């Protein structure tokens, strides 16, 4: 079984925490490092959240703080979904885990340059860290095996009618990534919204128990609350975790190759991922776009990872 070496770039975030939990435990994934970016909340908060998750689950992977601001646009956060801390719901003990002193962008560049081209980048927040790394050291581009990202949509957005939050939070960074020539896999809203976590799913993970079962329950109960308050929904998707699912077994997710372009023009479509689903532009595809996911398989995978945190001694 081949292990996928990855750097997980995230902005924790409730679904980010689920992605961290899965990536750190599944035997197919070799989680080299976690890089943090501003997104769901400001960088000081997303960093603390990432460290808290790692400490609670005893994940001994280095954590690096990255870009505190988007490349150009004014910063936005998703406090309506993720709360004042960015990870409201769970109660963590006193934090002793610390971030590394190296900046996330430098870590990404140095790690890729020293690699054999076998590292996959998994950005599940705004693409600020990845884009700045690409601009600072273009020689990393051929070193990236693949980028598997959560962001965008070929249908409607969730932060504006046109744009999904991660892309809208830094469209210029997304433009850099989507024009980089690196192989891209995009888990957009059309796919991730299929992973609706219901009270039944929460109860299933609670029955498994352990620290990850408890954390999953606390995270998703809060998510269900904000999803109902904001959208009237009885469940909440775990967007970012789909990227980890794809890396573990891409057969669980159907993709379609498309040409994708990020709209960086000011106006109602700012931050939209324009996906040429029908191929009408005649441009070569640059992205595998997620279409459907086997949800039974996916929740089984989540349960497998949750179960992995139960101590047997």
Curated annotation (Swiss-Prot):
Its EC number is 3.2.2.8. Pfam families: IU_nuc_hydro. It catalyses: a pyrimidine ribonucleoside + H2O = a pyrimidine nucleobase + D-ribose. Its cofactor is Ca(2+). Signal peptide: none annotated. It is an enzyme of class 3 (hydrolase). Substrate binds at residues 227, 239. GO terms for biological process: purine nucleoside catabolic process; pyrimidine nucleobase metabolic process; pyrimidine ribonucleoside catabolic process. One of its GO terms (molecular function) is purine nucleosidase activity. Keywords: Calcium, Glycosidase, Hydrolase, Metal-binding. InterPro entries: I/U_nuclsd_hydro_CS, Inosine/uridine_hydrolase_dom, IUNH, Pyrim_hydro_RihB, Ribo_hydro-like. Coiled coil: none annotated. PROSITE patterns: IUNH. GO terms for cellular component: cytosol. Binds 1 Ca(2+) ion per monomer. The keyword Metal-binding applies. Ca(2+) binds at residues 11, 16, 124, 240. CDD domains: nuc_hydro_IU_UC_XIUA. The active site is at residue 11. Hydrolyzes cytidine or uridine to ribose and cytosine or uracil, respectively. Has a clear preference for cytidine over uridine. Strictly specific for ribonucleosides. Belongs to the IUNH family. RihB subfamily. Homotetramer. This is Pyrimidine-specific ribonucleoside hydrolase RihB. It comes from Escherichia coli O17:K52:H18 (strain UMN026 / ExPEC).
């Amino acid at each position: 079984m081949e292990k996928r070496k990855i750097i997980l770039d995230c902005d924790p975030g409730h679904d980010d925490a689920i992605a961290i939990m899965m990536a750190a435990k599944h035997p197919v994934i070799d989680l080299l490092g976690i890089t943090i970016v501003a997104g769901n909340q400001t960088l000081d908060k997303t960093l603390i959240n990432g460290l808290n998750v790692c400490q609670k689950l005893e994940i001994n992977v280095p954590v690096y703080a990255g870009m505190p601001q988007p490349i150009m646009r004014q910063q936005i956060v998703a406090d309506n979904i993720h709360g004042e801390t960015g990870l409201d719901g769970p109660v963590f003990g006193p934090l002793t885990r610390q971030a590394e002193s190296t900046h996330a962008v430098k870590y990404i560049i140095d790690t890729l340059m020293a690699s054999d081209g076998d590292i996959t980048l998994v950005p599940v927040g705004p693409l600020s860290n990845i884009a700045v790394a690409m601009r600072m050291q273009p020689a990393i581009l051929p070193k990236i095996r693949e980028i598997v990202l959560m962001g965008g949509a070929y249908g409607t957005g969730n932060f504006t009618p046109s744009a999904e939050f991660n892309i809208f939070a830094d469209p210029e960074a997304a433009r850099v990534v989507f024009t980089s020539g690196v192989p891209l896999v995009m888990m957009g809203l059309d796919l991730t919204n299929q992973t609706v976590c219901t009270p039944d799913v929460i109860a299933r993970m609670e029955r498994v128990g352990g620290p990850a079962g408890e954390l999953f329950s606390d995270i998703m109960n809060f998510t269900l609350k904000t999803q109902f308050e904001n959208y009237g929904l009885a469940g909440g998707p775990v967007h970012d975790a789909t990227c980890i699912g794809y890396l573990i077994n891409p057969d669980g997710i159907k993709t379609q190759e498309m040409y994708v372009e990020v709209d960086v023009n000011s106006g109602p479509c700012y931050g939209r991922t324009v996906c040429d689903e029908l191929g009408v532009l005649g441009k070569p595809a640059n992205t595998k776009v997620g279409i459907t996911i086997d949800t039974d398989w996916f929740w089984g995978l989540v349960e497998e990872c949750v179960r992995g945190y139960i101590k047997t001694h």
